[in-house]
Design a protein with these regions (language model features):
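Glycine-rich phosphate-binding P-loop
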Residues: 5-19
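Extreme N-terminal starter segment of soluble prokaryotic enzymes
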Residues: 1-3
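Short glycine-rich anion-binding loops that position phosphate/pyrophosphate groups of nucleotides
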Residues: 66, 94-96, 170
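Post-Walker A helix-loop "phosphate-sensing" segment adjacent to the P-loop in P-loop NTPases
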Residues: 24-30
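ATP-dependent NMP and nucleoside kinases share a basic, alpha-helical "lid"
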Residues: 87-124
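N-terminal targeting leaders
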Residues: 101, 112, 119-123, 139-140, ...
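ATP-dependent small-molecule kinase phosphotransfer cores
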Residues: 35-90, 127
Length: 277
């Protein structure tokens, strides 16, 4: 299956290029809106995800660190599940971070000149040039900061991509055809090994998302690794009985063939003494 990620700036040409690439190749075009909808299975609403990605206000630090992990894992699980359903073109930001180690994924960055994006803001928002410029600068700053917090990367770093295109020097049609042509090259074709790696990555993301979303569990330092369907789960739990609960939950996840758990039990004060200590 083919996977193309197209990262782009706000009010750029990313959506148009992605939709055209998908049309040329006959792939499914997906965006954050589709991913957010899929994420609802893990208990994250569209409003919550938008708040994490774009709100100006800062969460209390510990709460933000915890929610950052939850949202990143849920988002990765959703996009991996969609990739398992067939050929996809994903457009948005940080798409290249969803498939680490999957060699047949083609990662694209579209660089649209600021002046062109300002014109788009003016047209869509009904703003004059200076307010539009300020709006765009603020939006870019917020989104870049949040992506760095979520993935610990500078998403504009060109070394994270296979191909960088300057849309000031090409049309949407030409850019789309260039991407489509590159995607057909041998190095971006799936192999049995890369398909297995994608399956394992999807299982890992699903396991992490399900365990994190479960209200029955209290796991810290959670680590999950999948090898050909065999899942290894480790971390710190507050009661020994939770280890079997985790194993039972993981076994029900599609694609899991075997579960091995490696937990350290460290009871919390509330578990030891209750609320009336």
């Amino acid at each position: 299956m083919s996977i193309i990620t197209i990262s782009h700036e706000a009010f750029g040409d990313g959506r148009a290029v992605a939709e055209r690439v998908a049309a040329i190749l006959g792939h499914r075009c997906i965006s954050r809106e589709v991913l957010v909808k899929a994420n609802e299975r893990y208990g994250i609403s569209e409003a919550k995800f938008s708040e994490v990605l774009e709100e100006k206000r800062h969460h209390w630090w510990e709460q933000w660190l915890e929610s950052r992990w939850v949202y990143r894992i849920a988002l990765q699980a959703a996009v991996c599940e969609l990739a398992q359903e067939g050929n996809i073109v994903y457009h948005g930001r940080a798409g290249q971070e969803f498939f680490p180690g999957i060699r047949h994924v083609l990662n694209i960055f579209l660089d649209t000149p600021t002046e062109s994006r300002i014109k788009q803001v003016m047209a869509r928002k009904g703003l004059a040039e200076e307010p539009a410029r300020k709006f765009l600068e603020e939006l870019d700053t917020i989104r870049a900061r949040r992506i760095k917090e979520l993935f610990k990367i500078d998403w504009r770093d060109p070394t994270r991509y296979d191909l960088v295109l300057n849309t000031a020097r090409t049309t949407v049609e030409t850019a789309a055809r260039m991407i489509a042509e590159v995607s057909q090259r041998e190095e971006y074709q799936p192999t049995p090994e890369s398909l297995q790696a994608l399956k394992d990555l999807t299982i890992t993301a699903r396991v992490e998302a399900v365990l994190i979303a479960s209200s029955r569990l209290d796991i810290s330092n959670l680590e999950v690794e999948t090898r050909c369907g065999e899942v290894h789960v480790s971390g710190i739990i507050v009661a020994a009985g939770l280890e079997q609960t985790v194993a039972d939950i993981v076994r029900k996840i599609p694609g899991v063939t075997r579960v091995k758990t490696y937990f350290v039990v460290t009871p919390s004060e509330q578990y030891l003494y209750g609320d009336g200590r």
